[in-house]
Amino acid sequence: MVENQSRISYLPTDGLTYDPSDSMYWDKTALDKEIERTFEICHGCRMCFKYCDSFPTLFNFLDKQYEGEVKKIKPQETQQIMDACFQCKLCEVQCPYSIRDGHEFKLDFPKLVHRHKAIHSKDKPKSLRNNILGNPDKSASMARASLGLANVMNRVGIHRWFLEKFLGIHRNKLLPYFSFTTFEQWATKLALIRENDKAETVLFQTCYVQHNEPQIGKDTIDVLDKNKVDCACVKGLKCCGMPAWEQGDLETLRANAKHNLDILIPFVEQGSKVLAINPTCVMMMRREYPALLEGDDRERANKLADAINDPSEFLWNIRNESRFNTNINNVPTETISYHAPCHLRAQGVGFKGRDLIKKVTGSKIKTVIECCGHDGTYAMKVESFDASKRIGQKSFDGMKTEETEVWVTDCPLAALQFKQHAGVKPKHPMSILADAYHSK
């Protein structure tokens, strides 16, 4: 594509950077130039109209108010466009002008949104909602300290009204259940915890599995064991930092990343692969840590990025080895509906959870790639709950077929979204395989 006839060049400005270690990253004038350029290119392309509301909002401003003049968009309207992005990453996957594809325009809309949020939240106090949603480890610890009361109250109308009015968490949003026992406590009890020991793999169970659904982690350990994969569990891991970073909180992201690197790198340097159960966490460690950390931490992040795998991805890579186990006691169902999470698609590594289930069980699998609309904390917020349901409707409808009784997704939060809006909670691929190995 050649440069268009407007006064705004499609070529990168001198303000182009996606690296927060670069002083230019924090220059608001430089950011505004890049936003203007990006809006101009997106206005001429419009391939991403079907994803989040950022693009329809941008196009509505240009078509209905400003006759296509990007320069007329006001700062508050830019804020509205940025707020509608929930970091699904699908626009970057599909963009023909991306850095990933080596195009000279070097577009990355999600990273531009992150930059905007980082600049506009820098040195400002965080809201109570952002403190709670951006720190799932702390929120879960508080919930567990209530001895089960939090789980009860999260389903009581008056309490949900309070959460909506004072925290901005939608009263109708199905919230995750908090487990009485963490995955780490279970692993400690079974003597699975190891420190700086040589292991083939080490598990990053994720904050969701740690606090909300330890069973997924247990199933993962079980499936790895069935395939003779040596896996170490470790103490003290923190959230990957994505909930904080989606709000522009770079400081918390970097602190969590540094903490996790301190624990994981000794294993990585001995040759261990790191298996993270949630695609979002894999994406953060594979793509975001190396780009967002600085100094020695960036070097360590690159080592981790080379070692990170999804459990299904790791098992798929050993499928031709003699230890790979296809001896099952139960076929879950003849046909399965599989949802591919956005952050798995963003990595470009294929759908190994789906492929693994098909290879081991022989089930026919229908694949649905539309976004479910949950996207981290987006679906929880009062201002975006309805939009998340609307955005996810195609995926809800796509999963429903008369011949499928079992639904699968690699993302536990997507499973929560399907449970609420489609009436079926998909299982994790590791849980499907664990059942297949054991059930009769």
Sequence positions of predicted segments:
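Short N-terminal secondary-structure initiator segments
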Residues: 2-11, 30-41, 48, 173-190
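Short low-complexity stretches enriched in small and charged residues
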Residues: 2-11, 44-50, 155-164, 230
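Non-heme iron-sulfur electron-transfer modules
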Residues: 2-24, 50-84, 98-128, 427-433
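Intrinsically disordered, low-complexity regions enriched in small/polar residues
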Residues: 12, 20, 53, 57, ...
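A short alpha-helix capping/helix-coil boundary motif
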Residues: 16-19, 28, 60-62, 71, ...
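Short, intrinsically disordered, charge-biased short linear motifs at domain edges
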Residues: 26-40, 70-82, 225-227, 357-360
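Cysteine-centered iron-sulfur cluster-binding motifs in ferredoxin-type domains/subunits
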Residues: 36-55, 77-101, 116, 140, ...
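Iron-sulfur cluster-binding electron-transfer modules in prokaryotic oxidoreductases
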Residues: 103, 107-440
